Amino acid sequence: MLGYSERDGFHGSKRLAKAMKQQQKKIKGVILMDMVGDRDLRITVPRNCTADLRLLALEAAEATGDRTKIGLFDGIIYDDHQAFLDLGFPAIDLIDFYFGNRPGENDYWHTTKDTLDKLSADSLLTTGRIVIEMINRL
């Protein structure tokens, strides 16, 4: 049996990043939004993101009045943005990694409890506001 890790799931992002590199696309920033629909929105920005984009995310959240919904994380999270970072593109991961029954549990992630009834239109709207503000400032 072959082993599997979370990094094995990045085939699509690796392919897209490689195509963008080959086409010499001028990318100002890759903004990944992952699991940002939770009712108790707590966006985390991991350390392995472009520093300027980390700062931009905080500034954008401040400008939209959503600063309490986003914070920096000193750890590394391997997610689809990593494929772009690896090829030299500026990239950021906006991820809510505290998705679950109780804050910090993350007990819904990749389970049968990860269902549409857990989504919040308000959380999606908040994330959208922040990202639009980021894009406008790029």
Q: Predicted segments — roles?
A:
Residues R102-L138:
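His/Asp/Glu-rich mid-to-C-terminal helical/loop segments that flank catalytic regions of hydrolases
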Residues I43, D66-D79:
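Short catalytic/ligand-gating loop segments at beta-alpha or beta-beta junctions
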Residues M1-D52, L56, H81:
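Acidic/histidine-rich catalytic neighborhood of metal-dependent amide-processing enzymes
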Residues K18-Q22, L58-D66, D86-F89, I132-R137:
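Sec-exported extracytoplasmic/periplasmic mature domains
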Residues E6-F10, P46-T50, R54, I77, ...:
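Solvent-exposed, acidic/flexible segments
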Residues M1, K28-D34, A91-I95, H110, ...:
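Structural recognition of the beta-strand scaffold that forms the well-ordered cores
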Residues G75-G100:
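Short glycine-rich, acidic/polar surface loops and turns
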